[in-house]
A protein has these predicted regions:
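Conserved beta-strand segments of alpha/beta enzyme cores
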Residues: 7-9, 58, 77, 108
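Active-site substrate-recognition segment that forms the wall
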Residues: 67-75, 83-182
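Helical element adjacent to the flavin cofactor pocket in flavoenzyme catalytic cores
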Residues: 23-89
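A conserved beta-strand/loop capping segment in the N-terminal third of enzymes
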Residues: 1, 19-25
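Dinucleotide-binding Rossmann-like beta1-alpha1 core, especially the glycine-rich loop
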Residues: 1-13
Length: 182
């Protein structure tokens, strides 16, 4: 990180614990990246939804895009399971399904679907004030408002929605080694 110019501060175990009062942290030390940040996906999506609606946009839930009326480079309408939707602009926000959803348009979306695994504690006994990476366990820990998310492992699997119990168990097993109170 230092070679790349990323700001960092090595921490003793005591300094790591001092960043998160009330949390029992078992560590040999840490590294603080003061410019790191994190967000709560539900809060972000709620804010984006509100901004779209304030700006006069329209959001349609439970509607599938089935094709496009798009002669040449002009998009006249999105064909959906609820009928055609015409507009001056469109936002395609289908995540991993965006390449499939955009079929028929003259766009190339170089995306690869993948899935990560996470466990969210709804009411942790104590809350972290900064995010953490449990390097040896390969688990990221992110405070999200009143919840705490432990996430690890990323699989590049295409649109396979199956869940590996082994990967989930690996995350669960790692938590008490670093945070005994969880």
């Amino acid at each position: 990180a230092e070679r790349l110019g990323v700001a960092l501060e090595p921490l003793t175990p005591e300094q790591a614990r001092a960043l998160n009062p009330g949390v029992d942290i078992q560590c040999a030390g840490g590294v603080l990246f003061p410019l790191d940040c994190f967000l709560s996906p539900p809060r972000l999506l709620a804010a984006l939804r509100a901004a779209i609606l304030r700006g006069g946009g329209e959001i349609r839930n439970g509607v599938e895009v089935t094709g496009w009326d798009a002669p040449g480079d002009d998009v006249r309408a999105a064909k959906t399971s609820a009928g055609d939707v015409s507009g001056a602009q469109y936002v395609l926000a289908a995540g991993s399904w965006s390449p499939r959803t955009s079929a028929g348009l003259r766009v190339r979306l170089p995306m690869q679907a993948g899935k990560g695994y996470s466990i969210t504690l709804e009411q942790p006994p104590a809350q972290l004030s900064v995010c953490a990476i449990l390097t040896e366990a390969r688990v990221a820990v992110t405070p999200m408002g009143e919840t705490l998310r432990f996430g690890g492992t990323m699989e590049v699997t295409g649109l396979d929605e199956s869940v590996s119990a082994r990967r989930v168990a690996g995350i669960i097993k790692s938590i008490p080694r670093y945070f005994p109170q969880y």
